[in-house]
């Protein structure tokens, strides 16, 4: 605050150093969760960028996106959406429909729609982006694969699993082929497909993929990595959902032991692991063991 105030007083409000200091102060407010103060500054930054550089300048576009993102983080989605829509219109008009900034702007607007529960509008934009990435970059480009995964996730969120699953399946095949079976993106893609299978009741198929992921995480990362713990917990939950408690409980027990050893008994993640195991005990009729974990008499 002192840096911004000093530069504004000595150099003037429109000096590049003053504008940079204001940017830094706004970002500091944003990182601290002081969204109202961040928004006030970012609105001023946008107004100045439009006045000094012009409404169609890259500086104005960047300032508009920063303000929209802050509105979004603050939960003021209607205001965020209005800015994202304006930015998409302006970028498409000035740079063209095929420009990377247009696709990025469309993605941001779609994400805000999704956050607001306007899934049909989000899906429409995600579909358009996937078509554009496939046409411009090719089906195997990382941006195309990421775009397909995003669209699949939106379908899943909307309950349109019959449309989500083929996209997740295609992505897993393509990522494994282009990046290799041991690549983190392959494991993430397999996890997404397994989750979609689980959500649609195809538990045996989900479990097979979750089992494969856990094996790979242990082999590639080791038994004590957070991703390994998460993978084990996910598999255990799938076993429990399928009524296979004899297989779920040992995994929950191992996870609680490992979380307690690596994070400590009072860590929130350890407490979640304890709760998961207690619920599995309860489902298996092992009430006394569940009570001990729940801390009830």
Q: Model-found features: residue ranges?
A:
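Intrinsic-disorder-linked linear interaction elements in eukaryotic regulatory proteins
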Residues: 1-297
């Amino acid at each position: 605050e002192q840096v911004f105030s000093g530069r504004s007083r000595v150099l003037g409000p429109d000096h590049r150093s003053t504008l940079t200091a204001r940017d830094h102060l706004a970002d500091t407010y944003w990182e601290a969760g002081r969204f109202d103060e961040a928004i006030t500054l970012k609105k001023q930054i946008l107004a100045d960028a439009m006045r000094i550089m012009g409404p169609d300048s890259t500086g104005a576009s960047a300032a508009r996106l920063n303000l929209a993102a802050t509105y979004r983080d603050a939960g003021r989605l209607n205001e965020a959406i209005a800015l994202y829509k304006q930015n998409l219109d302006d970028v498409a008009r000035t740079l063209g429909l095929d420009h990377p900034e247009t696709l990025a702007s469309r993605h941001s607007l779609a994400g805000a729609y999704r956050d607001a529960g306007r899934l049909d509008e989000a899906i429409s934009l995600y579909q358009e982006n996937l078509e554009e990435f496939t046409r411009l970059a090719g089906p195997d480009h990382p941006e195309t694969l990421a775009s397909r995964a995003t669209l699949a996730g939106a379908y899943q969120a909307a309950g349109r699993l019959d449309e989500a699953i083929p996209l997740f399946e295609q992505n897993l095949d393509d990522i494994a082929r282009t990046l290799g079976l041991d690549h983190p993106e392959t494991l993430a893609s397999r996890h997404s497909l397994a989750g979609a299978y689980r959500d649609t009741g195809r538990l045996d198929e989900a479990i097979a993929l979750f089992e494969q992921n856990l094996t790979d995480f242990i082999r590639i990362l080791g038994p004590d990595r957070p991703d390994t713990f998460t993978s084990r917990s996910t598999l255990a939950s799938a076993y429990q959902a399928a009524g296979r408690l004899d297989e779920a409980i040992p995994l929950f027990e191992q996870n609680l032991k490992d979380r307690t050893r690596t994070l400590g008994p009072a860590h929130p993640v350890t407490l979640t692991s304890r709760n998961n195991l207690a619920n599995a005990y309860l489902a298996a009729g092992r009430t006394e063991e569940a009570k001990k974990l729940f801390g009830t008499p």
